[in-house]
Amino acid sequence: MRLTPLLVALFGYIYCQETFVGDQVLEVIPNDEEQIKTLLQLEAEEHLELDFWKSPSVPRQTVHVRVPFASIQDVKVFLESQGITYSIMIEDVQVLLDQEREEMLFNQQRERGTNFNFGAYHTLEEIYQEMDNLVAENPGLVSKVNIGSSFENRPMNVLKFSTGGDKPAIWLDAGIHAREWVTQATALWTANKIASDYGTDPAITSLLNTLDVFLLPVTNPDGYVFSQTSNRMWRKTRSKRSGSFCVGVDPNRNWDANFGGPGASSNPCSDSYHGPSPNSEVEVKSIVDFIKSHGKVKAFITLHSYSQLLMFPYGYKCAKPDDFNELDEVAQRAAQSLKRLHGTSYKVGPICSVIYQASGGSIDWAYDLGIKYSFAFELRDTGYYGFLLPAKQILPTAEETWLGLKTIMEHVRDHPY
C-alpha cells in the first residue's frame, strides 16, 4: 500500500523541518580556468546560499550545485551572461526528498517484527540496534568498541571483527559527511557480510585469520541525526563555539594534514570550514587517538559519496606519494573487481588530480602517519541523484563496493609491512 501525501507531509514535518521546494541542482561545465575562477567567486556569494555538491576544479569537469528557489533566476542569468554552460540535473530537490521519506516510513512500518532491511535507510538508533544484534549473534567474532562520544554526547561505536590474538588491523569508516547516507548503509551491510560469511567464504575467513577489521559505520552521528530530523543537506558536525552563530565543522578538513591549506575554508559558515585547530572535532580526535594507541593499523579506508571514485593520497598537495605505483595498481584492481558485478565504472587516482586539492583530509593524515594503504571511496552515483540516492540502489552499491574493499584487504593481507 502506498502512503498518502498527507502521511508523507506529516513525516516530513516531524523528521525533516527544512524543506527544499523548488530548489534545483544544476550541472555546470566550465570551459577554462577563467570560468572556474568565476564559479569560485559565485560560490563565495553567501547571500545566494549555494550548495556545491561537486566544486569547481579543472576545466571541462562537471560542477554540481544546488540552487535555492529564490536564487535560481539570478544564478541562471549570471551563468548565461558569462557564457558558462549549464543544464538542470534535478528539477525539484523536494520531490526526491519526499520520495525518500516515504520509503523510510514505509520500511519502518514493514520492519516491525521482521528482519532488518539492509536495503533501506535507517535512523541512528536503528543502526546502533542492528550493530548490537550483530555482536549478540556472533560473540566469538564481533565485539563493540566505544572510542568516544560526539559533541552532542552520542556514542561512537566501532565494530571489531577478530578471531583473537594481537593482529595487524584494517580501519574502515563511513558517514563522516552526514548527508552521504548510502555510505552508512553500505558500511552496515558490509558488517553483516563479514559476520555472516566468516567460516563459509574462504576469502573472508582468510582475511580475519590474518587481520582484524575495525568498522565505524557512523563517523558523524550528530550530523547524521540532524540530516534526518532537520536538514537533509547537512554535511558538517554539530559543534558550537562562542563567538560564532554558525554551527559545525567539516570533519574531513579537520585532520592534521596540512591543516588550513588549500581546499578548506576559514569561514565558520562554510560547508568546508576546517575548524579552529587540527582535531578540534571530538569525532576526529577519537579516531586519531584510537588509531595511534592501537599502533598496528595497516590500512585506512573511508567511504564517501558521490561520484564513483577510488582515491589515495595526496589531497593537500598534488605531488605523488612515495607509494604511488603500488597504491595506483591496487586501486585499479579494486575498481575492476567492483565493475564486474553491475558494470559500475570508477575513476582512480590521487585526490588532488581526480577531484581537487583539499587539505585536512583523513586519508592524507593516515598516510603521513605511516599507514601505507590509505584509500577513499566515493560511492554511487555520478550525479543523477547525487546525495539523494534511492534506497533501491543501496544493495547493489554495497555489493559492488564489497568487491573493491575485498581486493584492497587481500592485498594488505598479502603484503605485510
From Swiss-Prot:
It is found in: Secreted. The keyword Zinc applies. Residues 120-412 form the Peptidase M14 domain. Zn(2+) binds at residues 177, 180, 304. It is an enzyme of class 3 (hydrolase). The keyword Disulfide bond applies. Disulfide bonds join 246-269, 318-352. Its EC number is 3.4.17.15. GO terms for biological process: proteolysis. Binds 1 zinc ion per subunit. The active site is at residue 378. One of its GO terms (molecular function) is metallocarboxypeptidase activity. Residues 17-112 form a propeptide. Its cofactor is Zn(2+). GO terms for cellular component: extracellular region. Its main location: secreted. Substrate binds at residues 177-180, 235, 252-253, 305-306, 356. Residues 1-16 form the signal peptide. Keywords: Carboxypeptidase, Disulfide bond, Hydrolase, Metal-binding, Metalloprotease, Protease, Secreted, Signal, Zinc, Zymogen. It catalyses: Similar to that of carboxypeptidase A (EC 3.4.17.1), but with a preference for bulkier C-terminal residues. Carboxypeptidase that catalyzes the release of a C-terminal amino acid, with a preference for large aromatic C-terminal residues. This is Carboxypeptidase A2. It comes from Mus musculus (Mouse).
